[in-house]
Design a protein with these regions (language model features):
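Positively charged n-region of N-terminal signal peptides that target proteins for export
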Residues: 1-4
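Conserved N-terminal structural module of periplasmic/extracytoplasmic solute-binding proteins
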Residues: 21-216, 220-222, 253, 262-263, ...
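Loop/turn elements at helix/coil->beta-strand transitions in domains of secreted/extracellular proteins
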Residues: 64-68, 95-100, 119-124, 141-145, ...
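Carboxylate/His-rich catalytic cores and anion/metal-binding grooves
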Residues: 144-172, 227-230, 234-264, 268, ...
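Helix-loop-helix "hinge/cap" segment bordering the ligand-binding cleft or interdomain interface
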Residues: 177-179, 184-248, 265-314, 321, ...
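Glycine-rich, aromatic-lined ligand/substrate-binding cores of catalytic
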Residues: 222, 289-291, 309-332, 338-342, ...
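Conserved small-residue motifs centered on glycine
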Residues: 395-517, 522
Length: 556
């Protein structure tokens, strides 16, 4: 089990090289500024480090060598000193800014961030996907400088250009009051901003379905018949649902059952309670019927999709899975030596529409995630802003993700960077990502500046022998015609969070207990009575609160 867990963690970390980590919502409170002592070393006055025309972006950023201290998540294992990375050396040469790095293992971010915030002395720049209290609380507490809006608009023209070109990214980077309070890590391909896709969903064992002489079903009824045939062939419990009774298959009825909020978007920007929709009841009725027929594994409430799926795949225990990560689709369980079953092939699917109409997906596009910010300890905030902006330049993006031109990448005839054979075809079979850790900062599972998904996909494809099943899965799961996912980047105020947090916990518990007990036949409460109880527990108030937050987001 320990070996399996270690392998699972390794693969999931590899997955983050493609998908990254999302940030959390931030509460809105009054901002004040507090003086803090400097944590930077070797910095000089503001005027000496900035150009006479701040609207222009030129290199080097400063005539005289300057230093900044940067705290960030970094989980690479090849280098111990980030200044030994070849791309980082080149960045220093171009910017004339030396960085005193404070790298933190991703698993330690929460603990280390808590300690840092209470210390009262901060590095010049912090890059993190964990921020206790949210942005406004840390402005009020004197951690984050309150003048980011001016700094960004004056000294970060390359970042601003991306925001001006992408409306969603601009909204996700902007607070409800219309200001830019921090710098967002932007997601995209080479030189553009574009959201990532859906990285988890329904998948079936293609090899087992073919052994039954069946083609992929295109309807819910077809899947029912396939599960029946699988059971008759010896697969005792062919469908595995989530521990809560939910499933991405519920999208067939146009509802989400795999959400902590159990909220979704309807027509014209309206927030809906998923558990109040007719489709929710139809999903539960179908699952109750399938469970009674022995098609759903009775141990679903204790099944761990991370740890238990390999054993299920190894021993052909299931035909259909409600929840698979893109990293484990195709025959990747075998590729990663997590199973010995070389025939296994997990084929992703979009849940077929139960009414025969258009398909659904639960997708929250994220172009601007996590946060980078300049702290109140920074004595040279203008230089810090310019240095952050370098990562949004063409040179910065190439150095951060492709490394050194002529060594780890070349430019093709269309001006597109392509990794060299040194990276993709190492004679010692060293993984491309491992090679790149010596040359490009981004390959230490480090998100700073812009997260280039194309570079990640190229490496993942090479590592998979030229066939990127993971990317193919993402494309399939993001192909639903209608999207019911809430937008990314909306924020609840501190007052709103306090008002609904307890209600949300109670509603979530009520929904999940009802789903499980109704499916297994232990609860005969009608769906209408269940909905009435949800409203009594404050479900509508939660819906209204999120509606207000999303309305503010849409009006940014």
């Amino acid at each position: 089990m320990k070996k399996l867990l270690a392998m699972m963690l390794t693969v999931i970390l590899a997955l983050t090289a493609l998908m990254g980590c999302g940030g959390s919502n931030d509460s809105t409170t009054k901002a004040t500024e507090k003086d803090q002592s400097s944590a930077s070393q070797g910095t000089q006055g503001t005027e000496e480090a900035t150009q006479s025309n701040p609207g222009e972006y030129t290199l080097p950023l400063t005539e005289e060598k300057q230093e900044l201290t940067v705290w960030l998540a970094y989980s690479g294992s090849v280098v111990t000193d980030l200044n030994e990375i070849e791309g980082v050396k080149k960045m220093e040469e171009l910017t004339n800014v030396h960085i005193n790095w404070i790298p933190i293992e991703q698993q330690q971010i929460s603990d280390k961030m808590g300690i840092l915030l209470t210390s009262g002395s901060y590095p010049d720049i912090i890059d993190t996907n964990v921020l206790p209290g949210g942005i406004d609380k840390n402005i009020e507490d004197g951690v984050i400088r309150p003048d980011h809006d001016k700094l960004i608009k004056t000294y970060m023209p390359n970042y601003m250009k991306y925001l001006e070109e992408n409306e969603t990214a601009r909204k996700q980077a902007t607070a409800d009051d219309g200001t830019l309070k921090i710098v967002r890590i932007l997601v995209g391909e080479d030189y553009n901003v574009k959201a990532e896709g859906v990285y988890q969903g329904v998948a079936y064992r293609k090899d087992l379905l073919e052994s039954l002489g069946l083609e992929e079903p295109k309807t819910i009824e077809g899947w029912h018949d396939a599960l029946v045939k699988a059971k008759e062939s010896g697969i005792e419990n062919p469908f595995m649902i989530n521990t809560t009774g939910g499933s991405f298959l519920s999208l067939a009825w146009g509802v989400t059952t795999m959400s902590q909020t159990y909220l979704q978007m309807g027509e014209n920007g309206k927030v809906l309670g998923a558990a109040l929709q007719d489709g929710f009841g139809q999903y539960l009725e179908t699952m109750r019927k399938w469970y009674a027929e022995g098609l759903i594994d009775p141990n679903f409430t204790s099944f761990n999709f991370y740890l238990d799926t390999p054993n299920s795949v190894e021993n052909n225990k299931q035909l259909l899975y409600t929840h698979i990560l893109s990293a484990f689709t195709g025959n990747n369980y075998a590729t990663y030596h997590m199973v010995n079953n070389q025939d296994e092939f997990l084929q992703p699917i979009v849940a077929p529409a139960a009414d025969g109409g258009e398909t659904y997906m639960d997708y929250s596009p994220l172009e601007g995630k996590d946060q980078m910010f300049i702290t109140t300890s920074c004595k040279n905030p203008e230089l810090a802003a310019k240095w952050l902006d370098f990562f949004f330049t063409k040179e910065g993006e190439l150095l951060n993700w492709y490394g050194i031109e002529g060594t780890t990448y070349t430019m093709d005839a269309d001006g597109i960077p392509q990794f060299t054979d040194m990276v993709l075809n190492d004679p010692n079979h060293t993984p491309p990502a491992t090679i790149l850790e010596k040359y490009a900062l981004g390959w230490g599972n480090c998100w700073i500046g812009k997260h280039n998904t194309v570079a990640s996909e190229k490496v993942a494809t090479a590592a998979a022998g030229g066939m990127n099943q993971q990317a193919a899965a993402v494309e399939i799961w993001t192909s639903g015609v209608k999207n019911i996912g809430l937008p990314s980047g909306y924020t609840l105020t501190e007052e709103e969070s306090d008002k609904v947090s307890t209600k949300q916990t109670a509603v979530q518990t009520l929904i999940e207990e009802y789903m499980v007990n109704y499916i297994i036949g232990n609860d005969d409460t009608s769906f209408e009575d269940f909905k009435t109880k949800l409203v009594q527990f404050g479900y509508q108030e939660i819906i209204d609160t999120y509606q207000a937050a999303i309305d503010r987001f849409n009006n940014r």
